[in-house]
A protein has these predicted regions:
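Conserved G1/Walker A P-loop phosphate-binding module
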Residues: 1-81, 90, 229
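Canonical P-loop GTPase G-domain recognition
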Residues: 5, 113, 122-184
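Conserved glycine(s) of the Walker
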Residues: 15, 155, 246
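Catalytic P-loop NTPase motifs of RecA-like helicase/translocase cores
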Residues: 38, 62-63, 95-96, 124-125, ...
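Conserved C-terminal guanine-recognition region of P-loop GTPase G domains, centered on the G4
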Residues: 47-52, 74-145, 216-221
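Active-site glycine-centered loops adjacent to acidic/histidine catalytic or metal-binding residues
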Residues: 57, 119, 149
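P-loop NTP-binding site
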Residues: 184-295
Length: 295
């Protein structure tokens, strides 16, 4: 059986988490239309009759402006240390940008096969597609170049088939009933954070995180208390909304997803706390599990 690790790498907001969710046919990694949604390394396990592939979804590589940004970059870079193959994902609709070039220069340092994955192919015509393929060929000798649409599941199965060619014959790495490395509390916090980002759109930047403070697993109901952390009072007011209307809406949308995940009723209580400059404070980054690659 073919098995191995595959890292999904790219600048922020090119569809890395969407691709992972498409491959696994589940909403494992949260997505939004804002750059930098993914903050932790998420492993999703794909298995079929002749392969087991561990896909590693990474934070988008970017030029950092704070301590959190530095940590996210280090997390993304670290994934190439123990993988068999790198998928370099780009947004073909946006063309070749400085962010893509920044990532590519880092990838050139790796002695690993790299498949260039051109995402959002459904949004460009064939002439632009061919033009960009030629430009990327001039930039680097990629092992393969693959156009896909992760959102529409276009050509993704063919990509999986190609990935298998680069994996060793080592048998299963994990038991068949495993599909991810993330904890339940992490999944809960990410679902809540996704709803914050989607409901508030451009009003709220990525200065938001979420922590599960209490969880009681009853037979017929899951009881969850979670805290949404922001760095400014003005952001808190947006998330809470008039008469707590926005916070109630965020909680309702999160509860729908969580009830589907747990398969039972969920009681979700949300709070919002202001911690100024939390992205620069080691104490809070450690509490949020975001400091493990700082040193």
């Amino acid at each position: 059986m073919k098995s191995g690790y595959v890292s999904i790498v790219g600048r922020p907001n090119v569809g890395k988490s969407t691709l992972l969710n498409c491959i696994l046919e589940t909403h494992l990694a949260i997505t939004s239309n804002k750059a930098g949604t993914t903050r932790n390394i998420i492993e999703g396990i794909y298995e079929d009759s002749d392969s087991q592939i561990i896909f590693v979804d990474t934070p988008g590589i970017h030029k950092p402006i704070n301590k959190l940004g530095n940590i996210l970059n280090k997390k993304a870079y670290s994934t190439s240390e123990n993988v068999d193959l790198i998928l370099f994902l780009v947004d073909i609709e946006a063309g070749i940008g400085k962010g893509d070039m920044f990532v590519l220069e880092k990838l050139k340092e790796e002695n690993l096969p790299i498949i260039l994955v051109l995402n959002k192919v459904d949004r460009v015509n064939k002439d632009k597609l061919l033009e960009l393929i030629m430009k990327y060929k001039d930039l680097y000798d990629f092992s393969e170049i693959f156009p896909i649409s992760a959102l529409k599941n276009d050509n993704v199965n063919a990509l999986i088939k190609t990935i298998k060619k680069y994996l060793p014959n080592e048998g299963k790495i994990f038991e068949s009933d495993m599909f991810t490395n993330i904890s339940t509390n992490f999944y809960i916090s990410e679902i809540i954070r996704q709803k914050v980002l989607r409901k508030t759109r451009e009003e709220v930047p990525h200065s938001v995180t979420c922590v599960v403070e209490k969880r009681i697993d009853n037979k017929d109901k899951e009881i969850i208390q979670a805290c949404i952390i922001v760095d400014r009072e003005s952001i808190k007011k947006i998330i809470v909304g008039k008469n707590a209307s926005m916070l109630k809406s965020i909680g309702m949308q999160a509860r729908i997803d969580l009830e589907e995940y747990f398969g039972k009723k969920v009681y979700l209580e949300l709070f919002v706390k202001v911690i100024e400059n939390w992205r620069e404070k080691e104490k809070y980054l450690k509490e949020l599990g975001l400091d493990d690659l700082e040193n």
